[in-house]
């Protein structure tokens, strides 16, 4: 199967060029913000792209990819492992991140393939994930706790995911439950600019909320913010993880109707 990757010279060239361009943008944004580019993770978003693209990204030095659909991610993680012919112990060569909204009926599957979840937004989801990850750990289906970002909703519209930041104590309650769990580890906060908001305004508000949360949860140092069109602004406001899809992989290839 590895030979199939070698035959994709054009695609590898595309991804190599795109990755260099995105890394250059990230380095420039870091320098402009007076930050070290090494403290900011570039997370390729591989949703709707094949496992062969993930294999190429891995060969180009990427160690994590993000997915937004649990079923697609589970299938792709298995395809990636088969494609490279790796053993179960070697599957960690790529860390799979869940960046989309998580349905509670998918947590058992997610607990087996996800290294990190960026979209934790309720006490019920924390409890369900804690149970599922604990079972996966006990059953030998994973080796480490699930890394967790708590997603916040800056405008209170929770239909798009996120804890309502305008509800007193809501964010702290979810963060506290993650910290009290047995199989989850709190990484930090994740946020997306609400529709119609100026990204600069949104990321500044996200930064302020992150600073507030850090006072009660000092280990929550991560800030997952910024995508293809606005990650430079997010870096200015303290993002430690930028989620880049289109600018890196191009228009989606596997989108289902």
Swiss-Prot record:
GO terms for molecular function: pyridoxal phosphate binding. Disulfide bonds: none annotated. SUPFAM superfamilies: PLP-binding barrel. The keyword Transit peptide does not apply. The modification N6-(pyridoxal phosphate)lysine is found at residue 47. The keyword Acyltransferase does not apply. Keywords: Pyridoxal phosphate. Signal peptide: none annotated. Belongs to the pyridoxal phosphate-binding protein YggS/PROSC family. NCBIfam families: YggS family pyridoxal phosphate-dependent enzyme. Pyridoxal 5'-phosphate (PLP)-binding protein, which is involved in PLP homeostasis. This is Pyridoxal phosphate homeostasis protein. It comes from Mycobacterium leprae (strain TN).
């Amino acid at each position: 199967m590895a030979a199939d990757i070698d035959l994709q010279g054009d695609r590898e060239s595309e991804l190599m060029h795109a990755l260099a361009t995105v890394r250059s943008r990230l380095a420039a944004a870091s320098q402009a913000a007076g930050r070290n580019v090494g403290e900011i993770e570039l997370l390729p978003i591989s949703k709707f792209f094949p496992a062969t693209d993930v294999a190429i990204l891995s060969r180009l030095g990427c160690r994590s990819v993000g997915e937004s659909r649990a079923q697609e991610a589970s299938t792709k993680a298995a395809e990636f492992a088969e494609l490279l012919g790796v053993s179960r112990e070697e599957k960690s060569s790529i860390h799979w991140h869940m960046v989309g909204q998580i349905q509670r009926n998918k947590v058992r599957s997610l607990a087996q393939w996800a290294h990190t979840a960026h979209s934790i937004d309720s006490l019920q989801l924390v409890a369900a994930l804690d149970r599922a990850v604990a079972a996966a750990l006990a059953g030998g289906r994973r080796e480490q706790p699930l890394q967790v970002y708590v997603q916040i909703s800056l405008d209170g519209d929770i239909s798009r995911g996120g804890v309502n930041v305008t509800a007193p104590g809501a964010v702290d309650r979810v963060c506290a439950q993650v910290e009290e769990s047995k199989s989850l580890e709190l990484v930090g906060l994740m946020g997306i600019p609400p529709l119609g908001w100026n990204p600069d305004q949104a990321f500044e508000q996200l930064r302020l909320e992150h600073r507030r949360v850090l006072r009660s949860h000092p280990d929550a140092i991560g800030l997952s913010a910024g995508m293809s069109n606005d990650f430079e602004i997010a870096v200015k406001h303290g993002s430690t993880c930028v989620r880049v899809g289109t600018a890196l992989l191009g228009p989606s290839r596997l989108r289902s109707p």
